[in-house]
Amino acid sequence: MSKVGIVILNYNDYKTTRIMLDTIKSYRSIDHIVVVDNNSKDNSYELLKEYESKKIDIIKAKHNNGYSAGNNVGVKHLIKKYNVDYVIISNPDIIVESEVITTMKKQMDKNDDIKVLSPVIHELSKIKRGWMLPTYYGEMITICNTRQRFHKNYGLYPESHYNDLLSEVDVVSGCFFMIRADVIKEVGYFDEGTFLYYEENILGNILKKKGYKTYVLNSVSVTHNLSVSVDKSIKKLNKYKILIKSLMYYERKYNKRNIFAMIFLNILFVLSYIFAYIKNLFR
C-alpha cells in the first residue's frame, strides 16, 4: 500500500504550524509528518518539539538557506527514513481536509502519468489552480509589477481549461501539492539556488523538459491563508528584491538567456526598484 508523507516548513511562526499539526495529526490519509524548522529566531523548534511522536518528526535546519533548501531537508528525511511513495509539500498556513489527501492519493495510484498533483487553492477571495511557464515578456511584467493593473490573466489558463476532472498545467502553486517521491529524487530535489520564490517555475520547467506531467485535480480544494510566515519576516521591498533575484536565476539557468537579454531585465529591475522606493517614501 502506497505511503504519503507531508513536509511542513516553519520559520518564526510556530503558532500557525501548531494549528495545522493539531488538525492533521490524526489524519489516516497521512502516514508521516515532518516539520522542518528553518532555523527560526524565536523558540519555534523547542515548542514544536512537543509534538514529536511516532508519526511526527520535528527537525531543525542548521541554517536558513531558503524555501527550497528547507523543504529538501524534509523530503530527503521522508524518503530515506520512511520510504514514502508520495510527498506533500505544504505551507503551515494551509487548511486541508483528510478526504482531499485521500482523493489525491487515489488519483496518483491509478494514473502513473501524474507526476505532480495539486488541488484547487482558495486564497483570500481568489481561486488559484495552475499557470503557464513564464515567457520573457511575462518576466518583464513581473519586474515592472504591472500584473495586477494591466495583465491580470497573462500566463493563466482560461476557465474552460478546468472543466474536466483533471487539468494539465505547466506549474502549480508551491503552497500545497503532491509529488511522486521517485520523481523529486530523480530531478535532484528542489533547486537550492533560490532563497524564496520561483521554486514552482523551476520545478515545472525541469519536469516539462523531461516530459513529466503536472495536473490540477478540480474536484478538491484547500484554503491558503496567504504568506503568513513571509509577511511576518520580510518587508515588501526586500520581498521584491528576492523575487527578482530568483527570476534572474531562473532565466539565466533554465531559459539560457543571453547576456543582452539579462542586461535588459536588470535595467528594468533597477528602474522599477527606484520607482517603488520613491513611491514608498511618500506613503
Predicted regions: what is each one?
Residues 60, 94-97, 103-187, 201:
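Acidic/His-rich active-site region of diverse nucleotide-sugar glycosyltransferases
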Residues 169-176, 181, 185-216, 220-222:
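Donor nucleotide-sugar recognition loop
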Residues 1-23:
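N-proximal low-complexity "stem/linker" segments adjacent to membrane-targeting elements
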Residues 205-283:
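Active-site-adjacent helix/loop segment of glycosyltransferases
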Residues 22-31:
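Short, acidic, metal-binding catalytic loop of nucleotide-sugar glycosyltransferases
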Residues 61-81:
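Glycine-rich, basic loop-to-helix element that forms the pyrophosphate-binding segment
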Residues 14, 23, 37-46, 63:
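A conserved acidic beta->alpha catalytic loop
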Residues 83-95:
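Short beta-strand-to-loop acidic/aromatic patch adjacent to the donor-nucleotide binding site
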